[in-house]
Regions:
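Extended, low-hydrophobicity, polar/charged segments
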Residues: 1-114
Length: 114
């Protein structure tokens, strides 16, 4: 088991959530790729969208169904500060995951999630 998957497993176990973690043999960079790989509808996939607070630099995580988009203006209203795009390096630094593979749990640093 990779270190990334071990962090996800530890986070789930710590929250007393019993889920099977699937390792995909092929790319699941998009929600559509993930849905095809497991044989489900795109909206049954959870997508992790990360923004960076313009004033604070802190990252903020939004979870949404795979077929949905997160509206940056609405996300800004929810968070209460202007949000910008988080780049790949910041996402990996904060979560330990690469873009396209950010799990909803098991991040390297605590992240506010909505």
């Amino acid at each position: 088991m990779s270190q990334s998957l071990a962090r996800v497993r530890a986070a789930l176990d710590g929250a007393r959530v019993s889920l099977e973690i699937l390792e995909m043999p092929d790319s699941t960079r998009t929600a559509a790729d993930a849905a095809r790989a497991v044989g489900c509808a795109v909206d049954q996939i959870v997508k992790s969208i990360i923004f960076r607070g313009e004033g604070t630099g802190h990252v903020v995580l939004f979870l949404t169904a795979g077929g949905n988009q997160v509206d940056p203006a609405r996300a800004t209203a929810v968070v209460g500060q202007p949000l910008g795009k988080a780049d790949a390096a910041l996402i990996r630094e904060q979560t330990g995951f690469a873009i396209g593979g950010v799990a909803p749990v098991g991040h390297l640093r605590p992240i506010t999630a909505f």
